[in-house]
């Protein structure tokens, strides 16, 4: 059996108010697998995604991404992951093109206007590339978030609450 792309072992998260969001989670995800996490509000789905992405630290347990530990090898693991958050988090006064291009740099990727153009065309946003984000509809803003998540060419993509908004 090949090594897991994402390996979660005995992962727990207890917040400062003693709320247990995750308790002894074990999960292995192989390359090419597509999974969906379903559960009620407060079940820990976003917490799990946030830990894998390095946004929240676990209380205990380990997570590896492509063999790299999410804590010890933070930059390496984070560069492999694209995240489309559940909340609209965009630079409102920037253009679509600049917003997506800027995201590449956050992951140490050199500018690549051709790659950004391809993503924007694939998401039917190319004709909006020079428009400020404040002028876009909610659905278009969601697509910009997807473009940002894909801009640094990750091998893993998380969609947190993809139907929200």
Where are these regions (language model features)?
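Walker A (P-loop) phosphate-binding loop of ABC-type ATPase nucleotide-binding domains
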Residues: 40-44
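Conserved catalytic motifs of ABC-family nucleotide-binding domains
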Residues: 153
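Conserved ABC ATPase signature
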Residues: 132-136
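Conserved ABC ATPase "signature" region
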Residues: 101, 105-128
């Amino acid at each position: 059996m090949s090594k897991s792309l994402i390996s979660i072992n005995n992962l727990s998260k207890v917040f400062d108010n003693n709320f247990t969001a995750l308790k002894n989670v074990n999960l292995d995800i192989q390359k090419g697998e597509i999974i969906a996490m379903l559960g009620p509000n407060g079940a820990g789905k976003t917490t799990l995604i946030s830990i894998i992405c390095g946004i929240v630290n676990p209380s205990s347990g380990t997570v590896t991404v492509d063999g790299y530990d999410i804590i010890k090898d933070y930059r390496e693991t984070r560069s492999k992951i694209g995240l489309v958050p559940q909340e609209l988090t965009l630079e409102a006064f920037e253009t679509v093109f600049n917003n997506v291009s800027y995201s590449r740099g956050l992951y140490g990727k050199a500018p690549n206007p051709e790659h950004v153009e391809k993503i924007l065309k694939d998401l039917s946003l190319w004709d909006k590339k020079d428009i400020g984000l404040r002028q876009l509809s909610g659905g278009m803003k969601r697509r910009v978030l997807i473009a940002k998540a894909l801009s640094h060419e990750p091998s893993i993509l998380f969609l947190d609450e993809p139907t929200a908004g």
